[in-house]
A protein has these predicted regions:
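A short Gly-Trp-Pro
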Residues: 1-111
């Protein structure tokens, strides 16, 4: 998750509305040339301007390791999450899971 103001994209994107685990929905944004899904805005996070960014779309994507896996109850059986400590059947409480510096940075952005 990053703050919307911290994202800069080269090129054009389009978007579509999709369902989400919360039931509130999300808007997914994708490259108009190749169709790759880049990020989404969850409707429940709109007031905070948080977006979920697909880190593999970044030039330096290897710097970003997952800190949590969500909705693992719906994962495909061939996905192996053994060894990952932060796996959740549904969403998690970010105050309990996120690193303190990430929570602080988010709070600074939304205040």
């Amino acid at each position: 998750m990053i703050h919307e103001d911290d994202l800069c994209i080269d090129g054009e994107v389009d978007s579509t509305d999709l369902p989400s685990g919360s039931g509130a929905g999300q808007r997914a944004y994708f490259c108009i040339k190749c169709g790759v899904y880049i990020y989404c805005k969850y409707k429940i996070a709109e007031p905070e301007k948080r977006i979920a960014l697909r880190t593999k779309t970044l030039n330096d994507h290897n710097r970003f390791l997952p800190e949590a896996h969500i909705f693992v109850k719906d994962k495909d059986p061939w996905i192996n999450l053994a060894g990952f400590k932060n796996c959740f059947d549904t969403m998690y409480d970010r105050e309990k899971v996120w690193p303190e510096k990430s929570i602080k940075r988010l709070k600074e952005k939304i205040c």
